[in-house]
Amino acid sequence: MERKLGPEFESCVKSGRIRRFSPGPTFVAGELAAASQDLDEARRTLAAGGLKWATIQAYYSMFHSARALLYARGYRERSHRCLVIALRELYVGPRLLELEFVEGLEAGKTLRENADYYSRFSEAGSRQAVELAGSFLARARTLTSEPVRPT
């Protein structure tokens, strides 16, 4: 039985912030590669003491992991908020992805914004962001290696 998509997701579709994107699955590998590269850079930057940039790079690793998941389902996003809504709808709702990963993405976004816009960052926050990014990438790789039919 096919699930009815929720009103927040439908609102994102209606506003054009989530769109059908049939070539999406062909972009998954590139997004995962970008996530991996950002994660590697975040780890190097953190090891060198660059807390602000490590936080920002870790968030973008999570963003690319999330985007890979969306592409795998044949959609693309035009807003970070709708990306989160789409992950909840397409992956968390049907119990394909644990909520902790979406909450981690949201926490990572807050850490990135604080670092980027307000120069507020810490070693603990940077380490948390890098750890979250590594876990999210591993989970996205697992999910995209399994056949997932477009919704």
What are these regions (language model features)?
Residues 1-151:
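Terminal alpha-helical segments
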